[in-house]
């Protein structure tokens, strides 16, 4: 089954014509098909009769209960205030096209579906027809039952708490329609803090694909709550670090308290976490160097940019008046290289237009979160920038600038870019855009080319931490860039971006707490560029469920079958768990349910999850043998009848996980 990673698939669909979208969706897996609205209008939903029949299976249990999110109340006024945070983002959320799609071309006789088999087309068409007839539940129904835990209504605060436990925020632009509808519902209904199924479906239908991904734990960090607890522990450990000195060469930097300390995380799927002083604005300073280099390469290409600047670490202080053997700055991360890169951006226009252009670019990278400007810092930098003026004149004498460049004007622009303000939260989204191949994770917009991202990360890895770059690459092994304001922009490629900020600096000019945090992070998690992902078992890998989790999943599955907890089994199936997992005696959940005589569990496993009714344990006993041995004749009869209908599924090239998702979700739907 295709995995919906981020919003790439939706972006692709939205760029196509209606006919193209229809053809694509009909060839896709049922998960995507069910997100479409019927051609006759309305939305896919189970009819009342079907809902009544399905309620014993779908109605109980659901998403695990979580404590209320920080600062979240169940009162209507405070929930409205919480939901109101999403209204500041002008970017609309990514959602499936609402217009009816035109019929696409028919599949040829030799075509296969998204699962690599020719039966997928019939499954999709059959599922689509049944949904139109109200015989099967929609994804919105499944999501409702997942969260409701057997209740007829969902408290709004419970939905928001469950949403936050996945790492998504109510302010996420991709959830704008959902949050707007929730806000409207709270204002217009008498029972504003409770959502029945119809109201819930109305609220989530525009963003159902993203929400389904979130609640099925299909984001890059599946267990985000556990991961953030580790981040908080590392934060507290680094907070104890003393020493270092706040930069004081200009008064605007010296005014910051040495006790300020914040860490923000944003994954490539838009999962967010912040701890500490993450909303305090500070200047990017040298952290802007990789960003403006990325802009230059994105606009002009690698070959043109590197006519003027090299790619090698200099081995010297970042502000030395020194060029390489070709009379070019060594790299874009030293002051000389950054000044030259600044001269390449939007040549031929005045500084005001250049500055607006870069600000708009950085706003896109930050997903329209806070990006500001400190005029006081700019004025102070210009007044105390004698060394940078000396570097500028040296570069001019060596003809390092493009022809016709106004060197003094370029230095003004350079000081302006150093004075751009961010918060830890907005800068973490910028870092996540670099981690995500140039796509902003919270808007889905492509901001940078893959070439620009690759080159930027390479230079951050080798030259980003001043004179500490070699040691940082050795010990931490991740692309990063530090600044004199105390920030460290850290990128874990294909996983997440982070901003660590604490003003006290070590003798190399890097944040003391930030360096300590980065070391601890890589000691705990296998994020180092050269950690062996397959054999390095001593480190935590937040990107996948570990061995302990797999053991727990078998225990939880068999225990739910033993106790007859259909609600838990439904939740496991929705999370794409393998419902045919075996214990050390090769016994499955169906063995246990048959031995205990749980009719509803047996029906659920057979009819909804489509498990194999013939599995044999270590003693060659099948579930039918278990039912007969313990005298559960009703279960024996069900198994006997189902064996006639069962068709074994062969192996496919898509892997066991895709088969599991196909069986579970397609069976559930």
Curated annotation (Swiss-Prot):
GO terms for biological process: chemical synaptic transmission; glutamate biosynthetic process; glutamine catabolic process; intracellular glutamate homeostasis; protein homotetramerization; regulation of respiratory gaseous exchange by nervous system process; suckling behavior. Changing residue 394 to A: Decreased enzyme activity. It comes from the Eukaryota. Residues 93-103 have a biased composition (Pro residues). Isoform 1 and isoform 3 are detected in brain cortex. Isoform 3 is highly expressed in astrocytoma, ganglioglioma and ependymoma. Isoform 1 is highly expressed in brain and kidney, but not detected in liver. Isoform 3 is highly expressed in heart and pancreas, detected at lower levels in placenta, lung, pancreas and kidney, but is not detected in liver. Isoform 2 is expressed in cardiac and skeletal muscle. SUPFAM superfamilies: Ankyrin repeat, beta-lactamase/transpeptidase-like. Its EC number is 3.5.1.2. It is an enzyme of class 3 (hydrolase). Residues 653-669 have a biased composition (Basic and acidic residues). Residues 68-118, 647-669 are annotated as: Disordered. Residues 1-54 form a transit peptide. GO terms for molecular function: glutaminase activity. Changing residue 249 to A: Loss of enzyme activity. Residues 315-322 are annotated as: Highly mobile activation loop. Keywords: Acetylation, ANK repeat, Cataract, Cytoplasm, Disease variant, Epilepsy, Hydrolase, Mitochondrion, Phosphoprotein, Repeat, Transit peptide. SMART domains: ANK (SM00248). It holds the Pfam family EF-hand_14. The record marks 72-73 as: Cleavage. It is linked to Developmental and epileptic encephalopathy 71: A form of epileptic encephalopathy, a heterogeneous group of severe early-onset epilepsies characterized by refractory seizures, neurodevelopmental impairment, and poor prognosis. Development is normal prior to seizure onset, after which cognitive and motor delays become apparent. DEE71 is an autosomal recessive form with onset at birth. Death occurs in first weeks of life. CASGID syndrome: An autosomal dominant disease characterized by infantile-onset cataract, erythematic subcutaneous nodules, profound developmental delay, self-injurious behavior, and intracerebral glutamate excess. Histopathologic analysis of skin lesions show deep perivascular and periglandular lymphohistiocytic infiltrates and pronounced leukocytoclasia at the surface of the dermis, focal vacuolar alterations, hyperkeratosis, and parakeratosis of the epidermis. NCBIfam families: Gln_ase. Homotetramer, dimer of dimers. The tetramers can assemble into rod-like oligomers (in vitro), but the physiological significance of this is not clear. Interacts with RAF1 and MAP2K2. Interacts with ATCAY; the interaction is direct and may control GLS localization, negatively regulating its activity. The C-terminal ANK repeats prevent the assembly of the supra-tetrameric filaments. A highly mobile activation loop at the dimer-dimer interface is important for enzyme activity. This is Glutaminase kidney isoform, mitochondrial. It comes from Homo sapiens (Human). The lineage of its organism: Eukaryota, Metazoa, Chordata, Craniata, Vertebrata.
